[in-house]
Amino acid sequence: MSIRPLHDRVIVKRKEVETKSAGGIVLTGSAATKSTRGEIIAVGKGRILENGTVQPLDVKVGDIVIFNDGYGVKSEKIDNEEVLIMSESDILAIVEA
């Protein structure tokens, strides 16, 4: 299945988080926090401004981002993989190598 976000929304695949503590203890359950980093796998066409023009997004497919995992972020399963649907405004930063 393919998914195409609308307007200023993006689809993010969450990056796996390290599940061991600094001391080598394996973290499980609530002790293992979910990562707030992910890879952009799809982007919408952009935000529609009041004058009707479309402002393109600053992020692109393949970007690694840090995002706010809050109220506006929707989790969905696509082809048995969890993806996150969010607005570009939920993205805090692009990780540059």
Swiss-Prot record:
**Nucleotide-binding as a keyword?**
no
Alphabetized UniProt keyword annotations: Chaperone, Cytoplasm
Which Pfam family, just one, is annotated for this protein? Cpn10
Asked whether the keyword Transcription regulation is assigned, the reply is no
Localization recorded for this chain is: Cytoplasm
A GO molecular-function annotation: unfolded protein binding
Whom does it interact with, and what assembly results? Heptamer of 7 subunits arranged in a ring. Interacts with the chaperonin GroEL.
Q: Which family does it belong to?
A: Belongs to the GroES chaperonin family.
Q: State the protein's purpose.
A: Together with the chaperonin GroEL, plays an essential role in assisting protein folding. The GroEL-GroES system forms a nano-cage that allows encapsulation of the non-native substrate proteins and provides a physical environment optimized to promote and accelerate protein folding. GroES binds to the apical surface of the GroEL ring, thereby capping the opening of the GroEL channel.
Record-given protein name: Co-chaperonin GroES
